[in-house]
C-alpha cells in the first residue's frame, strides 16, 4: 500500500469504476425486502451546498448499509426545474450579456434559452453529487420537466379538477411586483421596521355625528395610499363611541366615495382610534371583513405596484361591478406605490383632514427571492382544495403509518395541517408546467391533458378558437408527486410495485409544509394498494437541522460565510476562496468585511481533506433535528482518523502479507488480546447497528471512531507485539488471523460512512481472507453474534489496560523517561489480580516497559514508592535512584508558582464588579471553569511534592 493516504488519487477513479460496474442499481431480487430513498431533488441549475452534502451523506450511509444487508435497494436521483429561481437566473444572464428582457425574446424563445442554460449548467450539481460518493442509480435519473413527469403532472391536475378539488377563483394573493407573480405564504419573509401611523379624518355623511358630537371619524392607517380603494370603515360593535353609527356612511376623502360603516370584531377598541379603513382588494384582513359584510372590492394597483389609470371594481364574489365609479384622481394615476403614499398624505393634509402622524413599529412582508415589499393583490388564480386532501394525511401520522424522527416535528406538522388553507398553485411565470386549461372567446374554461382531448371531450369544432392558460404551476406541485411520478406513474410499473411506499425521506424542517405535507396529501389521494387503501409516500421522515457556521450564523452569500463542501474535499487557495466569496455580490459594500473575516479564518486557504473525512464529520455532527455549527477542527480530526486507519492497515498488511494467516487450516492459538479484540468488535457491531437502525448517525460515528482509534489502533496493535516478536507458530497464526479478520470486518462496518478508503484497503485485505468478490459495497454487513460474547477476555484485558495506564501515568507525573525500565510491585492483590499478572507477565512487561513484576505479601509495606490504586490491587513503583530529589522538587515548585499566578489573575477578574456586570454569562462561566481546572492541577502538584519529599 502507498505510504501515505492520498484521497485525491483514489476517490474519483474508484467512483467511476463503481458506476461503470452498475453496483448502484437495485439487485432486482424480489425475494428480499425492498429499501428505497427518494433524493430531495436539488435545483437543476444550482450547485451543491453544505445542506445538500449533509443530507446526502446521511442518505448514502443508509443506502449502503441496507444494500450490504442484501435488500433490493434503490436510491432514486433527480433534479427540480425550480421555477422562479431558474427563470431569475436566466433573466439576469440575458440582461447582463445582451441587455434584453424575456419579453424581448418572447415565451417560446425564452423557454428554449432556459433549456440551453440547463444543458450547460445542469450537470454541475450531478457532477458534485458523484464527488460525494453518492451511490444513486444514475440510469433512472429524472427531471421534474421531463416527459414522464410532465404527463404525471397533467394527469393529477385533470383528475383533481374533475373531482372538483381544483378550482379557479379571484382571491387575494401575495404578489411580487418585481417578479410579477403570485408567491406562496411560505416564500414571504416578514421583516420588522420603523414606520408611521397616519390618523385621517373621514367626514360623516347625512349630518351624522359621533357620541361626542364630531362630524367625522378618525381612521388610523399605516398604508394611506390604499385609501383610494376603501369600500368601508369598521368599528367594534361593542364600542360605545361608534356603535350607533353602524349602518351609516362616511364620505371618502379625495374620491368622495360614499362608503358604509360596518360593525366587526376586527376593529379593536384599544388600538389606534378604534376605526379601521377597509380595503378588501389590498389587505388580507380587510378581504375577510369585506366578505363578511358583502363589501365591493376595488383594485387600484397594476401588477408592477403602480396606481392604475382607472380602478377595477368587483362585487364581493369577484364579478365586475358598476356599484362604484372606477375613476382615480388624475394626480395619483401611474404613480409608483410609495410615491403615491406621499402624494395621498399631502393631498389629505391640504384638505385639513390629516389629524396626526405617530411613529409605529411595523412588520413588512418581503419576497424572499425578489427582495421587494409584497403587495396583497386581487387576481384570478388556480387553487387546490386542501382540507379534503389533508384529512387522510393527518390520520396517517396519527396512526403511525408515517413516523417523524425526531417525534417533536409531528406537532409542527399537525398544527399546520389542521388549519390548512387552500393552496394557490398558479404562478405568473414562463418556466414550469403550463396549466392544462384552455379558454374560448366567451371565457369558458376547459381542462384536459392536451388541446385535442379538450376539443374531443367538449365537441368543439375547428372553428372554435381556444387559447391555453398563460400561467404555470407552482414548482412544489410537481415536487409533491415525486415519490410516485419518478417510478413511472400513471403507468402501473414494476418499479412502482417494488419500491412504493418508499422507506425513508430525509428533509430539512424548513420544507415540512412546502413539500413533506404536500407529498403525503397527493400520494395518499392517487396511490392505493390492492385493497384500495391509500398508500403513504414513505414510512419515516428523518428531519435534519440547518448547518450554520462556527459562530452559529446561518450560511449566506451576503454574510460571506458559505463553505463549499467540495472546497473541503479538494482544497482551495486563499485568493480563490476570496474571489468566490466576494465576486459578483449583490451587495458589493460588504466585500471588505467578508475579505477580512475570511483571511483571519483561513490564512492559507482550505487544505484538501478528502470526501471520506467530510462525510465522517457530517455523520458525527448529525444529532437528530438539531442545527449544527460547522467545525473545521472536527474535519481535521476525521482526516487524521482516515490517516490512522490507513497506517494501521499498512501495519496489519506488513505483518500478514505473504505469511500464514490460518485461513487454510493449521493450528491456531488465540492470545488474550486476540480474544479481547474479537469480543470488543462483536459488541461494537451490536451498538453500531442499533445506532444506524435508530437514525443516530452521530452515535454510530462515535462508536466507529472509539473502536478504531482507541481499541484497535492504540491498544490491540500494541498488544500484538509480544506475540509478533516471539510467539509460537500457532500463536502467530492466531494473531495474524485475528488482525486480518477484525480489519476486514471493520472495513465493512465503516464502509457506509467512509466508502472510498474502506474499498481501497479492502481490495488488499480480501486476498488474505480468500474472498474473491469484486467490491466491498456488495459484501454482507457485519452481524452481531451472541455466541461470541467473551466476558472473561473483556474483563481481563480491561484490568491489564488499567495497570499499563497507571504505570504510564506515574512516568508522566514523575518526569521519568518513557524508555527507562521500571520495577513494579503489587500489594494487596485479589486472587483475580494475581491470576491476571501471572498469566500475562509478558504483555505487562513489554507494554509498560517493566524490568520486573513482584507480588508483595499482604503485610509487606515495600520501599518508598509512588502508588496507584487499580481494581483489586495497589501498584507501587519504587522511586530510589529514579529521580534527582532536589531538581524534581525545584521543578514542581516552579510549576506551582506558575499556576498560582493564573489562579490569582482569574480571581481578580471575577472580583471585578465591572467585568462581571458587562461580560456575557458564557464568558464568566468559562473563567470559573478555568479556575476549577487550575485548582485541581495545583492540588495534584502538591500531592506529588509530598511523595517526592518523603523519598
From Swiss-Prot:
GO terms for molecular function: aminoacyl-tRNA deacylase activity; ATP binding; magnesium ion binding; valine-tRNA ligase activity. GO terms for biological process: cytosolic valyl-tRNA aminoacylation; positive regulation of translational fidelity; valyl-tRNA aminoacylation. It is found in: Cytoplasm. GO terms for cellular component: cytosol. Changing residue 277 to A: Reduces posttransfer Thr-tRNA(Val) editing rate significantly and alters amino acid discrimination in the editing site, resulting in hydrolysis of the correctly charged cognate product. The keyword Nucleotide-binding applies. A motif ('KMSKS' region) lies at residues 554-558. Signal peptide: none annotated. Residues 880-944 form a coiled coil. Its main location: cytoplasm. A motif ('HIGH' region) lies at residues 42-52. ATP binds at residue 557. Keywords: Aminoacyl-tRNA synthetase, ATP-binding, Coiled coil, Cytoplasm, Ligase, Nucleotide-binding, Protein biosynthesis. InterPro entries: aa-tRNA-synth_I_CS, aa-tRNA-synth_Ia, Anticodon_Ia_Val, M/V/L/I-tRNA-synth_anticd-bd, Rossmann-like_a/b/a_fold, tRNA-bd_arm, tRNAsynth_Ia_anticodon-bd, Val-tRNA_synth_C_sf. It catalyses: tRNA(Val) + L-valine + ATP = L-valyl-tRNA(Val) + AMP + diphosphate. Its EC number is 6.1.1.9. The keyword Nucleotide-binding applies. Monomer. ValRS has two distinct active sites: one for aminoacylation and one for editing. The misactivated threonine is translocated from the active site to the editing site. The C-terminal coiled-coil domain is crucial for aminoacylation activity. Catalyzes the attachment of valine to tRNA(Val). As ValRS can inadvertently accommodate and process structurally similar amino acids such as threonine, to avoid such errors, it has a 'posttransfer' editing activity that hydrolyzes mischarged Thr-tRNA(Val) in a tRNA-dependent manner. HAMAP family: Val_tRNA_synth_type1. Belongs to the class-I aminoacyl-tRNA synthetase family. ValS type 1 subfamily. This is Valine--tRNA ligase. It comes from Escherichia coli (strain K12). The gene is valS.
Amino acid at each position: 500500500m502507498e505510504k501515505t493516504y492520498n484521497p485525491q488519487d483514489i476517490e474519483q477513479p474508484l467512483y467511476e469504476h463503481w458506476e461503470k460496474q452498475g453496483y448502484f442499481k437495485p439487485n432486482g431480487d424480489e425475494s428480499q425486502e425492498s429499501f428505497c430513498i427518494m433524493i430531495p431533488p436539488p435545483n437543476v441549475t444550482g450547485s451543491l451546498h453544505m445542506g445538500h452534502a449533509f443530507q446526502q451523506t446521511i442518505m448514502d450511509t443508509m443506502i449502503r448499509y441496507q444494500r450490504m444487508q442484501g435488500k433490493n435497494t434503490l436510491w432514486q436521483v433527480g433534479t427540480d426545474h425550480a421555477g422562479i429561481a431558474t427563470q431569475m437566473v436566466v433573466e439576469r444572464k440575458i440582461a447582463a450579456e445582451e441587455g434584453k428582457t424575456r419579453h424581448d425574446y418572447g415565451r417560446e424563445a425564452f423557454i428554449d434559452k432556459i433549456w440551453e442554460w440547463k444543458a450547460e449548467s445542469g450537470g454541475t450539481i450531478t457532477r458534485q453529487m458523484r464527488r460525494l460518493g453518492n451511490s444513486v442509480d444514475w440510469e433512472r435519473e429524472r427531471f421534474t420537466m421531463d416527459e414522464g413527469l410532465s404527463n404525471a403532472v397533467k394527469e393529477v391536475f385533470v383528475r383533481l379538477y374533475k373531482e372538483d378539488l381544483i378550482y379557479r377563483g379571484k382571491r387575494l394573493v401575495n404578489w411580487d411586483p418585481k417578479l410579477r407573480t403570485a408567491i406562496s405564504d411560505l416564500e414571504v419573509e416578514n421583516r420588522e421596521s420603523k414606520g408611521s401611523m397616519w390618523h385621517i379624518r373621514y367626514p360623516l355623511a347625512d349630518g351624522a355625528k359621533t357620541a361626542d358630537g364630531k362630524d367625522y371619524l378618525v381612521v388610523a392607517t399605516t398604508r394611506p395610499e390604499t385609501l383610494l380603494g376603501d369600500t368601508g370603515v369598521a368599528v367594534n360593535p361593542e364600542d360605545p363611541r361608534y356603535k350607533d353609527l353602524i349602518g351609516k356612511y362616511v364620505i371618502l376623502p379625495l374620491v368622495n366615495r360614499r362608503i358604509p360603516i360596518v360593525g366587526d370584531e376586527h376593529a379593536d377598541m384599544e388600538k389606534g382610534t378604534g376605526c379601521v379603513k377597509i380595503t378588501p382588494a389590498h389587505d388580507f384582513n380587510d378581504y375577510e371583513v369585506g366578505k363578511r359584510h358583502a363589501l365591493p372590492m376595488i383594485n387600484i394597483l397594476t401588477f408592477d405596484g403602480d396606481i392604475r389609470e382607472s380602478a377595477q371594481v368587483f362585487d364581493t364574489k369577484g364579478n365586475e361591478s358598476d356599484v362604484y365609479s372606477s375613476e382615480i384622481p388624475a394626480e395619483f394615476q401611474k404613480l409608483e406605490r410609495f410615491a403615491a403614499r406621499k402624494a395621498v398624505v399631502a393631498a389629505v393634509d391640504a384638505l385639513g383632514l390629516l389629524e396626526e402622524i405617530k411613529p409605529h413599529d411595523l412588520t413588512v412582508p418581503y419576497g424572499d427571492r425578489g427582495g421587494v415589499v409584497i403587495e396583497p393583490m386581487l387576481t384570478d388564480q388556480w387553487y387546490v382544495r386542501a382540507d379534503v386532501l389533508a384529512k387522510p394525511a393527518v390520520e396517517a401520522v396519527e396512526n403511525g403509518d408515517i413516523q417523524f424522527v425526531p417525534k417533536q416535528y409531528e406537532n409542527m406538522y399537525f398544527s399546520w395541517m389542521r388549519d390548512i388553507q387552500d393552496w394557490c398553485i398558479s404562478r405568473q411565470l414562463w418556466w414550469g408546467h403550463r396549466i392544462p386549461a384552455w379558454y374560448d372567446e366567451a371565457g369558458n374554461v376547459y381542462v384536459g391533458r392536451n388541446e385535442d382531448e379538450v376539443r374531443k371531450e367538449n365537441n368543439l369544432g375547428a372553428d372554435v378558437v381556444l387559447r391555453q392558460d398563460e400561467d404555470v404551476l407552482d414548482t412544489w406541485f410537481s415536487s409533491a408527486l415525486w415519490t410516485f411520478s419518478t417510478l413511472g406513474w400513471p403507468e402501473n410499473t414494476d418499479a412502482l410495485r417494488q419500491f412504493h411506499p418508499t422507506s425513508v425521506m430525509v428533509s430539512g424542517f424548513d420544507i415540512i409544509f412546502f413539500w413533506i405535507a404536500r407529498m403525503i396529501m397527493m400520494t395518499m389521494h392517487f396511490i392505493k394498494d390492492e385493497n384500495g387503501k391509500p398508500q403513504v409516500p414513505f414510512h419515516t421522515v428523518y428531519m435534519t437541522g440547518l448547518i450554520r457556521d462556527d459562530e452559529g450564523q446561518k450560511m449566506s452569500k451576503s454574510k460571506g460565510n458559505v463553505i463549499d463542501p467540495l472546497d473541503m474535499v479538494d482544497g482551495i487557495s486563499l485568493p480563490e476562496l476570496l474571489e468566490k466569496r466576494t465576486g459578483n455580490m449583490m451587495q458589493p459594500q460588504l466585500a471588505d468585511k467578508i475579505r477580512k473575516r475570511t483571511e483571519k479564518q483561513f490564512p492559507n486557504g482550505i487544505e484538501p481533506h478528502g470526501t471520506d473525512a467530510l462525510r465522517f464529520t457530517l455523520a458525527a455532527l448529525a444529532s437528530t433535528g438539531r442545527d449544527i455549527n460547522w467545525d473545521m477542527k472536527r474535519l481535521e480530526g476525521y482526516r487524521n482518523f482516515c490517516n490512522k486507519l490507513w497506517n494501521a492497515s499498512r501495519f496489519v498488511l506488513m505483518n500478514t502479507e505473504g505469511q500464514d494467516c490460518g485461513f487454510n487450516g493449521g493450528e491456531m492459538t488465540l492470545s488474550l488480546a486476540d480474544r479481547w479484540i474479537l469480543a470488543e468488535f462483536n459488541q461494537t457491531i451490536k451498538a453500531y447497528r442499533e445506532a444506524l437502525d435508530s437514525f443516530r448517525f452521530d452515535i454510530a460515528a462515535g462508536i466507529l471512531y472509539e473502536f478504531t482509534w482507541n481499541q484497535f489502533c492504540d491498544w490491540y496493535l500494541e498488544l500484538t507485539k509480544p506475540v509478533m516478536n516471539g510467539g509460537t507458530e500457532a500463536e502467530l497464526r492466531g494473531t495474524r488471523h485475528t488482525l486480518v479478520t477484525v480489519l476486514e470486518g471493520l472495513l465493512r462496518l465503516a464502509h457506509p460512512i467512509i466508502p472510498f478508503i474502506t474499498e481501497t484497503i479492502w481490495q488488499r485485505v480480501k486476498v488474505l481472507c480468500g474472498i474473491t468478490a469484486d467490491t466491498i459495497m456488495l459484501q454482507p454487513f457485519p452481524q452481531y453474534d451472541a455466541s461470541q460474547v467473551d466476558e472473561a477476555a473483556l474483563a481481563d484485558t480491561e484490568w491489564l489496560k488499567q495497570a499499563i495506564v497507571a504505570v504510564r501515568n506515574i512516568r508522566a507525573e514523575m518526569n521519568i523517561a518513557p524508555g527507562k525500565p521500571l520495577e513494579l510491585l503489587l500489594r494487596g492483590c485479589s486472587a483475580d489480580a494475581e491470576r491476571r499478572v501471572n498469566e500475562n507477565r509478558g504483555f505487562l512487561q513489554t507494554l509498560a516497559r517493566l524490568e520486573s513484576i513482584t507480588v508483595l505479601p499482604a503485610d509487606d509495606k515495600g520501599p518508598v514508592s509512588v502508588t496507584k490504586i487499580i481494581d483489586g490491587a495497589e501498584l507501587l513503583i519504587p522511586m530510589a535512584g529514579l529521580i534527582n530529589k532536589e531538581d524534581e522538587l525545584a521543578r514542581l515548585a516552579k510549576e506551582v508558582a506558575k499556576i498560582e499566578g493564573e489562579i490569582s489573575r482569574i480571581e481578580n477578574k471575577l472580583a471585578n464588579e465591572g467585568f462581571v456586570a458587562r461580560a456575557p454569562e458564557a464568558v464568566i462561566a468559562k473563567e470559573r471553569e478555568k479556575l476549577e481546572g487550575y485548582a485541581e492541577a495545583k492540588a495534584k502538584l502538591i500531592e506529588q511534592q509530598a511523595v517526592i519529599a518523603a523519598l
